[in-house]
Amino acid sequence: MGNDKRVRKPEWLKISIGANERYTETKRIVESHCLHTICSSGRCPNMGECWGKGTATFMIAGDICTRSCKFCNTQTGRPLPLDPDEPTHVAESIALMKLSHAVITSVDRDDLPDLGAAHWAQTIREIKRLNPETTTEVLIPDFQGRKELVDQVIKACPEIISHNMETVKRISPQVRSAANYHTSLEVIRQIAESGITAKSGIMVGLGETPAEVEELMDDLISVGCKILTIGQYLQPTHKHFPVAAYITPEQFAVYKETGLKKGFEQVESAPLVRSSYHAEKHIRFNNK
């Protein structure tokens, strides 16, 4: 996986993380409740912008993942037992932040009999109990394709359920640990068939072609996906999958136009876009 011929990062990807008062307060709430966020563990380039607006994507079920995807910076290994108080802590933090829309994700918990599905459902219910006016978006793992586990999340009634395809069909086996392209499509199909808005996200710059991205779009449309996010892959460390190319802002604009023409209701496509970027804008598509 080592690649001495690294592609130079272009100017449009160079950002600074500002720390305004809202950023500091968001950081204080997250740390005081011993919460994990994908913003920090995933080294998200938008953390300054989002935390500065008082929004964050909470990561539940711990901060150690049972999988080791070659694009992801989340720690891998043997996770700790689930914290039964975590659903309440997350819900309380959302109340303190006065969020109108909350985004939740998790590590994979292949070590648990139910892969964390009950914990997921309880977290969503607790958020709704303490924050009845807050809408929720959840970015879920594949639950190994077990429909009864995905159904537990569906029955908790979040407004949007997202499951990321991550990359095109050809590259998926190279970078997604224990995940399967077609299994992910079936998870998204199950979400869409439930009536809940289905969303997915991909990274580009891994060596895919525009034709492969269009094929992935067609696959997502065929299973009922309504919202798509597309962002530049950034190699977290030299041990991770190398960046094959930095996609230009112009090509991202083409992907957005193509996706909308193919039938997505919303496409976020730009170099720094990540799964939950501008997630609050997407909720309106669930309320038509």
From Swiss-Prot:
UniProt keyword terms in alphabetical order: 4Fe-4S, Cytoplasm, Iron, Iron-sulfur, Metal-binding, S-adenosyl-L-methionine, Transferase
Keyword Transcription regulation: no
GO MF term set: 4 iron, 4 sulfur cluster binding; lipoate synthase activity; metal ion binding
Broad enzyme group: transferase
GO cellular component, one term: cytoplasm
Domain of life: Bacteria
UniProt keyword 4Fe-4S, yes or no: yes
Location(s), subcellular: Cytoplasm
Pathway annotation from the record: Protein modification; protein lipoylation via endogenous pathway; protein N(6)-(lipoyl)lysine from octanoyl-[acyl-carrier-protein]: step 2/2
Chain positions recorded as [4Fe-4S] cluster 2 binding sites: C65, C69, C72
Catalysed reaction equations from the record: [[Fe-S] cluster scaffold protein carrying a second [4Fe-4S](2+) cluster] + N(6)-octanoyl-L-lysyl-[protein] + 2 oxidized [2Fe-2S]-[ferredoxin] + 2 S-adenosyl-L-methionine + 4 H(+) = [[Fe-S] cluster scaffold protein] + N(6)-[(R)-dihydrolipoyl]-L-lysyl-[protein] + 4 Fe(3+) + 2 hydrogen sulfide + 2 5'-deoxyadenosine + 2 L-methionine + 2 reduced [2Fe-2S]-[ferredoxin]
Cofactor note: Binds 2 [4Fe-4S] clusters per subunit. One cluster is coordinated with 3 cysteines and an exchangeable S-adenosyl-L-methionine.
Cysteine disulfide links: none
Positions of transmembrane segments: none
Pfam families, per database record: Radical_SAM
Cofactors required: [4Fe-4S] cluster
Enzyme Commission number: 2.8.1.8
Main location: cytoplasm
Xref: CDD domains: Radical_SAM
InterPro entries xrefs: Aldolase_TIM (IPR013785), Elp3/MiaA/NifB-like_rSAM (IPR006638), Lipoyl_synth (IPR003698), rSAM (IPR007197)
Chain ranges of the Radical SAM core domain: 51-265
UniProt record similarity statement: Belongs to the radical SAM superfamily. Lipoyl synthase family.
HAMAP family xrefs: Lipoyl_synth
Protein known as: Lipoyl synthase
Species of provenance: Bacteroides fragilis (strain ATCC 25285 / DSM 2151 / CCUG 4856 / JCM 11019 / LMG 10263 / NCTC 9343 / Onslow / VPI 2553 / EN-2)
